[in-house]
Swiss-Prot record:
Domain of life: Eukaryota
Main subcellular localisation: membrane
Function recorded in the entry: Sperm surface membrane protein that may be involved in sperm-egg plasma membrane adhesion and fusion during fertilization. Could have a direct role in sperm-zona binding or migration of sperm from the uterus into the oviduct. Interactions with egg membrane could be mediated via binding between its disintegrin-like domain to one or more integrins receptors on the egg. This is a non catalytic metalloprotease-like protein.
Stated name of the protein: Disintegrin and metalloproteinase domain-containing protein 2
Signal sequence interval, chain numbering: 1-16
Stretches assigned to the Cytoplasmic side: 718-745
Region feature (Disordered): 654-674
Source organism per UniProt: Bos taurus (Bovine)
GO cellular-component term (any): plasma membrane
EGF-like domain mapped to chain residues: 611-644
Keyword Signal applies: yes
Extracellular compartment spans: 17-696
Length: 745
């Protein structure tokens, strides 16, 4: 126990060393209960977290604050500035609230476990992963800031008042967004105080930015960390003197050295063991390139939560938002942001009606236009850096530094330019060998399951084709089960994988009897307070139950094996304690068949129609299956797209496989042209080749008949007019003869 306590004291969290008093440390295993994703990134997520014996539901929404060109800067041994190469994630920062507590706030990072702050109206809890831990264990602790007398700001000195605000609702803001781009400099002493580890310090500055962001949510402001600078070995300016002197010294330095790094505000964060001042800025000068700066003094008596309040107050002052006169201003909570006491209080802090009015006044003026610049906040935000070993935008290749490149067996890439060597087509990839593309038809990703499909090199790309698999809902496992995401969700295999030989999927009576008991033997879920019962229609989707026909006792690590005799059959199941990382093994897997046209989904037996399985065997001429793109994957010797034509010796596949049919197929088959530079382009081309074309031969057959008919009509017309002319001439001649034969008087 003593070792564990020392370990906990060394963990990095929302506070540094003795910044704040931790009350009783609690341990919890957060449970994810909801998640919504977009583009492979969770945009909304909810967790159940146990705090002081009570469960709370925390709802979170992604809150990005790093721009696409974000960089961390340091200095080389010669004193020249250089970018520091570190892995950053811009998609694992969230902001939200605790369900049922309208005046709550949650600021959480999920990059490595849950790390952040849970703020109720007047109390804050820190949460961070327990390291090392086998499971998803976290520790939760209440943060109680220590009292301190350092609360005076140089540019706007305000008397610290102990009188309470008059509480009144604040009018809502108009629905528009503003953005503050912030450059932060961490001086040497603070870098050491935060752990003297670049990764740890960066993580804490990210947390600080997230906390500051949460404060400005009510004003529809997003605080962007545009860039970060670490003074690791030495400070670039003296950091002695009071905050006012340091502020003028810093803005003078920033005018010369931060010209090329865009920002609305630049902050110097300085560590002081004790200080009468905790910050300084120029009031109302945020968008001024000469005076848009501030200094925050981080003393040993404040937490990261308190430092976020200091940053928020400095940003507010720089927008012309003064401290509150608590005799005139109204606060929607106990303490508002622009009260010096906010630095030493826990819980959610909002802006008073005076602050809102001052903010609206500031953004109505032309000098606030810098806040309307919306940075690009892509999750993939890093600019390309040649030599870091990762191929980024604008690079053909990147083998690392010159030494690493020279050590490779095939030198396909020029280390200095990140371009291919002359004559090289590739340097890495499943379909690249000796700097050249592997010929078409080579299997680059073999199938791993009867519901998975081979992918092949296409001969024109270093990348293997996109992973494709049999369409969800296709029967498998001797037509007893269904394919889901390239895996046959086979109940028999689930039992074998856990219990080994001698086991099989339990019959219906085992599920009906045991999973309706709502105890260790069978249930539809485990919570911190007990079991979730199975309804009669969901009994086959709760605890996984298997039959066992051997006499040996089964042992499963960290689990209890439950035995039951049901109508002469031994039915067995597992039980893990709540929060165990392997507890998913004791449930029937999603996608397992639970009835006619029904499958298990989230421990419920639901209609399988949501899989949208629509592959009729006749679509592929009974010679193939549909893949997840709903294209036919043909059996060997049959050609896509519809498996209608044959080509003896061809291994089979689809228009998505990469092994497109040969350029000269057997007689009777359609002709193919081998064109394409990438897997996607080639797929489009082949699909167009196979697309049916309108029949045109009747048109060409009709043309000769049409010409003959036209000639015939022209001839008849000519004959008609010729004969008419002859008749007219004959009539005229007859009249002349008749007149000549008449007697004269």
């Amino acid at each position: 126990m003593l070792c564990l306590l020392f370990l906990l004291l060394g963990l990095t969290g929302l506070q540094t060393d003795d910044n704040s008093e931790r009350l009783r440390v609690q341990f919890t295993v957060p449970e994810k209960i909801r998640s919504t994703s977009s583009g492979g990134v969770e945009t909304h997520v909810s967790y159940i977290i146990l705090i002081e014996g009570k469960t709370y539901t925390v709802n979170l929404m992604q809150k990005a604050f790093l721009p696409h060109n974000f960089r961390v800067y340091g200095y080389s041994g010669t004193g020249s500035m250089k970018p520091l190469e570190h892995e950053f994630q811009n998609f694992c920062y969230y902001q939200g609230y605790i369900e049922g507590y309208p005046n709550s706030m949650a600021i959480i990072s999920t990059c490595t476990g849950l790390r952040g702050l849970l703020q109720f109206e007047n109390v804050s809890y820190g949460i961070e992963p327990l390291e090392p831990s086998i499971g998803f264990e976290h520790m939760v602790y209440q943060i109680k800031p220590r009292d301190s007398s350092s609360s005076v700001y140089t540019e706007r000195e305000i008397e610290l008042r102990e009188k309470p605000y008059k509480i009144q609702n604040v009018e809502p803001l108009p629905d528009f967004s503003q953005y503050i781009e912030m450059h932060i400099v961490v001086e040497k002493d603070l870098y050491n105080h935060m752990g003297a580890d670049t990764t740890v310090v960066i993580q804490k500055i990210f947390q600080l930015t997230g906390l500051t962001n949460a404060i400005f949510t009510s004003l529809n402001i997003t605080v962007i960390l545009s860039s970060l600078e670490l003074w690791i070995d030495e400070n670039k300016i003296p950091v002695t003197g009071d905050a006012n002197e340091l502020l003028h010294r810093f803005v003078k330095w920033k005018r010369s050295y931060l010209v090329l790094r865009p920002h609305d505000m630049a902050f110097l964060l300085v560590y002081r063991e004790k200080s009468n001042y905790i910050g300084a800025t120029f009031q109302g000068r945020m968008c001024d390139k000469h005076y848009g700066g501030g200094v925050a003094l981080h003393s040993s008596t404040i937490s990261l939560e308190s430092l976020a309040v200091i940053i928020a107050q400095l940003l507010s002052l720089s927008m012309g938002i003064p401290y509150d006169d608590i005799n005139k201003c109204h606060c929607p909570g106990d303490v508002c942001i622009m009260n010096p006491a906010a630095v030493h209080s826990s819980g959610v802090k909002l802006f008073s009606n005076c602050s809102v009015e001052d903010f609206l006044r500031f953004i109505s003026k032309p000098k606030s236009q810098c806040l309307q610049n919306q940075p690009r906040l892509d999750p993939t935000y890093k600019s390309a850096v040649c030599g870091n070993g990762k191929v980024e935008e604008g690079e053909q290749c990147d083998c690392g530094n010159k030494k690493a490149c020279d050590a490779l067996p095939d030198t396909c890439c020029v280390a200095d330019t990140c371009r291919f060597q002359p004559g090289s087509a590739c340097d890495t990839g499943l379909c690249c060998e000796s700097c050249a593309f592997i010929p078409k038809g080579h299997i680059c990703r073999g199938s791993t399951d009867e519901c998975d499909l081979h992918e092949y090199c296409n001969g024109s790309s270093a990348a293997c084709q996109e992973d494709v698999y049999v369409q969800d809902g296709h029967p498998c496992g001797q037509n007893q089960w269904l394919c889901i995401s390239g895996i046959c969700v086979d109940g028999i295999k689930q039992c074998f994988d856990i219990f080994g030989e001698g086991t099989s999927y339990a019959p219906a009576e085992c599920f009906q009897r045991l999973n309706s008991m709502n105890d260790l033997s069978g249930n539809c879920g485990v919570t911190p307070t007990g079991f979730t019962p199975c309804t009669s229609e969901n009994v086959r989707c709760g605890k996984l139950l298997c039959t066992y026909d051997k006499r040996e006792v089964i042992s499963v690590e960290n689990a209890s094996v439950m035995y039951s005799n049901i109508n002469g059959k031994i039915c067995i199941g597992l039980h893990y304690e709540y929060g165990n990382e392997d507890e998913g093994m004791m449930w029937v897997k999603d996608g397992t068949v639970c009835g006619e046209s029904k499958i298990c989904q989230n421990k419920q037996c639901v209609d399988s129609s949501f899989l949208n399985y629509d592959c009729n065997p006749e679509k592929c001429n009974n010679q193939g299956v549909c893949n997840n793109k709903k294209h036919c994957h043909c059996n060997p010797s049959y050609l896509p797209p519809n498996c209608e034509h044959s080509a003896p010796g061809w291994e089979g596949g689809s228009i998505d496989s990469g092994n497109f049919p040969p350029s000269e197929p057997p007689t009777g088959g359609p002709a193919f042209t081998d064109v394409g530079t990438t897997p996607l382009a080639e797929s489009r081309y082949i699909e167009n080749v196979y697309r049916s074309k309108p029949t045109r031969w009747p048109f060409f057959l009709f043309i000769p008949f049409f010409i003959i008919l036209c000639v015939l009509i022209a001839t008849l017309v000519k004959v008609y007019f010729q004969r008419k002319k002859w008749r007219t001439e004959d009539y005229t001649s007859d009249e002349q003869l008749e007149s000549e034969s008449e007697p004269k008087d």
